[in-house]
């Protein structure tokens, strides 16, 4: 989920509440808080706790919330994980060690420490195309409350390999929006990504329709969706910001530095035309 921000970079709680209520109204399956899209790494620990508290207070268990707690130090991740559980998070997620070159042993120690500090389900967040070894999977399977993974990779065989090696015991989420249907073929149970803030209902519909056998429609949608992603990727934040304003009346604000992308002034006509093309795959909008 986006973390809406004010001009000074602080969290905009008013817009965040509007976004959360929108997601609940749309009957999406959950909220992933303070991940890459939510700019979690760009907030200090105290601000991350404040955002988590506010979001969990708003949701009031009306929708599952997974809080991302990845940080530079394992100790901070542990504090954030405990805080999230104390305030009602349904699950916790974390990337592996960052900045310092991490060995598999470092990653395992990091994940074990976070998981041991909480009782709610834990979902490591694997980013990149580095494969997860059989040994790593065996060790992760020994962590009692590790219930799955978020996998942001373009390598579908890696996702399938993890599904096979884990014996189907884990709930896997794909993180590459442009491959959400492809990943479903490899055993993912759902998808977590930035574009679902704007296109959540249609993406949920298409993914389920694909699983139900509507492959021609899903292929047509995915090509349309992938074309859009390729077009907007260089200036994706400005597209999201204006798109959310036009479609839902929600201002997510500018991206926090250094995440800012080039400030491209997308025309409202172009934005709405592209949004309509993607949303045309929703039955209620295309009778």
Segments (PLM) and residue ranges:
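C-terminal alpha-helical cap/extension of soluble enzyme domains
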Residues: 1-2, 22, 26-28, 37, ...
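Active-site beta->alpha loop and helix N-cap motifs at the rims of alpha/beta catalytic domains
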Residues: 3-131
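Solvent-exposed, flexible loop/coil residues
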Residues: 6-9, 15, 47, 103, ...
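A general structural signal for well-ordered alpha-helical segments in protein cores
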Residues: 16, 48, 52, 77, ...
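Short alpha-helix boundary/capping motifs
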Residues: 51-52, 83, 87, 112, ...
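A broad structural signal for alpha-helix termini and local helix breaks/kinks
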Residues: 59, 118, 166, 247-248, ...
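Catalytic alpha/beta core domains of metabolic enzymes, predominantly
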Residues: 113-117, 128-233
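Glycine-rich phosphate-binding "P-loop"
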Residues: 122, 145-146, 256
């Amino acid at each position: 989920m986006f973390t809406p921000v004010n001009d000074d970079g602080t969290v905009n709680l008013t817009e965040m509440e509007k976004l959360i209520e929108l997601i609940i109204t749309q009957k999406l399956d959950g909220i992933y808080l303070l991940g890459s899209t939510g700019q979690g790494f760009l907030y200090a620990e105290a601000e991350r706790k404040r955002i988590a508290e506010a979001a969990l207070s708003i949701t009031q268990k009306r929708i599952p919330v997974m809080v991302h707690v990845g940080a530079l130090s394992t100790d901070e991740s542990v504090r954030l994980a405990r805080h999230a559980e104390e305030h009602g998070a349904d699950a916790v997620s974390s990337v592996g060690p960052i900045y310092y070159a991490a060995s598999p042993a470092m990653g395992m120690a990091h994940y074990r420490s976070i998981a041991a500090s909480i009782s709610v389900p834990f979902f490591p967040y694997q980013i990149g195309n580095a494969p997860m070894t059989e040994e790593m999977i065996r060790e992760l399977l020994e962590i009692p409350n590790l219930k799955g993974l978020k996998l942001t990779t373009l390598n579908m065989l890696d996702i399938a390999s993890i599904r096979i090696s884990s014996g189907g015991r884990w709930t896997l989420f794909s993180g590459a929006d442009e491959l959400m249907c492809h990943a479903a073929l490899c055993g993912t149970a759902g998808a977590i990504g930035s574009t679902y803030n704007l296109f959540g209902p249609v993406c949920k519909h298409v993914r389920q329709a694909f699983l139900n056998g509507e492959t021609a429609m899903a292929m047509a949608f995915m090509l349309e969706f992938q074309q859009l992603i390729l077009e907007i990727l260089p200036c994706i934040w400005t597209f999201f910001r204006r798109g959310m304003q036009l479609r839902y009346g929600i201002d997510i604000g500018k991206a926090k530095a250094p995440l800012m992308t080039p400030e491209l002034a997308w025309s409202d006509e172009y934005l709405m035309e592209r949004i309509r093309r993607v949303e045309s795959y929703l039955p209620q909008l295309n009778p």
